[in-house]
Amino acid sequence: MSIAKWRQKLNKGEVSSLELINQQINRIEEVENTLHSYLYLNHEKARASAIKIDEARAAGEELPPLAGVPFAIKDNLCTKGIPTTCSSKMLEEFIPPYESTVTQRLWKAGGILLGKTNLDEFAMGSSTETSAFGPTKNPWDITRVPGGSSGGSAAAVASGLCTAALGSDTGGSIRQPASFCGVVGLKPTYGRVSRWGLIAFASSLDQVGPFSTNVSDAAEILQVIAGHDPRDSTCLDVPVPKYSDHISESISGLRIGLIKECFDQEGLDLEVKKSVLKAADQLQSLGAELIEVSCPRFTDGIATYYVIAPSEASANLARYDGVKYGYRAKEVDNLSDMTAFTRARGFGSEVQRRILIGTYALSAGYVDAYYRKAQQVRTLIRRDFENAFKNVDILLTPTSPTTAFKSGAHQNDPLAMYLSDLLTIPANLAGLPSISLPCGFDEKALPIGLQLIANVLDETRLLQVAHQYEQAAEIMNSAPESSLIN
């Protein structure tokens, strides 16, 4: 049920907020042991919040836009008084003394916290297998990964363990799991949504966004969480449009660009390619014009990203040294050993790998050859997008080259794991808004994701095109049956 339909039923008194919360809790008790999408459950407080909303409605009070909607929150967003672990032993016992801006805005709008979701440790991964607390399973096939790093949020939405969720996206961590789990995942323009209270991975790339079962809900949630925040110096001080007012507008005459380099990729699965091109044809039937465009440096994004992101991570994660908070190694004789053993034992292998890569790239003898060169290539990638948007309104690609892969398939091959973000990374490097939504299923009944990319701050058009495609294609109405899917 969409947020709009839920709100209508709540306002008419056809259903209570407590009833919805109890439905979600019952669903969690039914399938969570199989999926492991949550790290922390907030059931009793959620019920108490729902009762307050029902009392306000009964008293005739005007309800906020997300009143009673149950949310799951990725466990790298700070929630005051509630554990926020980043799926790491390093922060296993960390309880933030403050609330992140995005969650604060959700609760003010009437949203209810159901729980905190699993992720790759410190959001570094593409499968949710690097979590210190165990992997999350894909609800379409529990032998496969849900994607990452926001795999817990994607799996929870797909399986009906919440109505919507928040995740973070540094190189595809919302869109890739959305693709693997058959849900909608939106990465806004860099700076459109505050990062205050998001535990940093790579500060020039991180962005918070929603997961939902439909584009309309994503638009409603973005409307609530977007907007200027003086506590985040990178947060843009620009008006936030009413996205929901525009998603039903016709896309006739819009120019959709198919990025040539994405469809020529050697590793692109043929079923994925076929589904995405069929989606492009559907958009054409709605009146859009299809234009092939070239972004020559698009596929250089992954090499660029894996210099810049680890470099920023090595700086951001330097604060975890056992001195002020977080895990601290015991039975050490001096400060130097305490720091070394704290980091060696507190961080998992993937986080350590990226810290080492970043430290190397920033070292005195290599900073010009690697980090500064990567920043130059990042500028060229951004210029490719700028040139493309002179001729088109929206860009279209697959979200990921493949559907969800088997658990453990890439654990000993980091490069193969990294390549699953090949098509999502460039939008992060350029700071562009992007969305993934289902566009079909492969022969194994696994969902395939369509990625749409818009120009800076053009989420309105992005959501409009995504919504029009979703309404016309009705992909999820013909989805294969699964007991773990909502």
From Swiss-Prot:
Catalytic activity: L-glutamyl-tRNA(Gln) + L-glutamine + ATP + H2O = L-glutaminyl-tRNA(Gln) + L-glutamate + ADP + phosphate + H(+)
EC number: 6.3.5.7
InterPro entries in alphabetical order: Amidase, Amidase_CS, Amidase_dom, AS_sf, GatA
A Pfam family the protein falls into: Amidase
Cellular component per GO, a single term: glutamyl-tRNA(Gln) amidotransferase complex
One record GO biological process: translation
List of catalytic residues: 74 (charge relay system), 149 (charge relay system), 173 (acyl-ester intermediate)
Enzyme class at the top of the EC tree: ligase
Keywords noted in UniProt: ATP-binding, Ligase, Nucleotide-binding, Protein biosynthesis
Any GO MF annotation of the entry: ATP binding
Record family assignment: Belongs to the amidase family. GatA subfamily.
Role played: Allows the formation of correctly charged Gln-tRNA(Gln) through the transamidation of misacylated Glu-tRNA(Gln) in organisms which lack glutaminyl-tRNA synthetase. The reaction takes place in the presence of glutamine and ATP through an activated gamma-phospho-Glu-tRNA(Gln).
Quaternary organization: Heterotrimer of A, B and C subunits.
Descriptive protein name: Glutamyl-tRNA(Gln) amidotransferase subunit A
